Amino acid sequence: MDTLSHALWGRGLFGYKGKPYWSLFFGVVPDLFSFGIYFLINIFNKSNSEVRVSIETELPNYVYSLYDITHSLVIALIFVLVVYFFINNKLAFAMLAWPFHIVLDFPFHTAEFFPTPILWPLYDVRFDGVSWSTPLVWFSNIGGIIFLYLYRFIKNKKSN
């Protein structure tokens, strides 16, 4: 799934209990802390004038390691539970955008392009899903986001 969609799903599903911006942030955390770090390093690396990620791009090993860590339901749920029990339950609710990101990713990433290791480090299970750029998946995603925000808008209007 694209990063913007993850942000919108995170905000729409988990941003209505007082932490809307945190839900946006946690919706993109898995991509931000894997590909985002790579992107920033390349911006500041003077030898590269362009930053493009494709199937043909040779990525450094740390990107794959960070992807495994940030795209694991095990890791995400540990963080959410620690925050829930020891810090702030409203923040923990917004943080649920992170595991939801993972749940959205694993059926829509192919084996060729970052299959999602949802049970890492316990099990290195990865699924060969349908590409999120497939028209049926892409338009269903957009339709789902529109429906979610219309629902939130109507529900908010009725309560005010």
Describe the role of every protein-language-model region:
Residues M1-N160:
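N-terminal membrane-targeting hydrophobic helices
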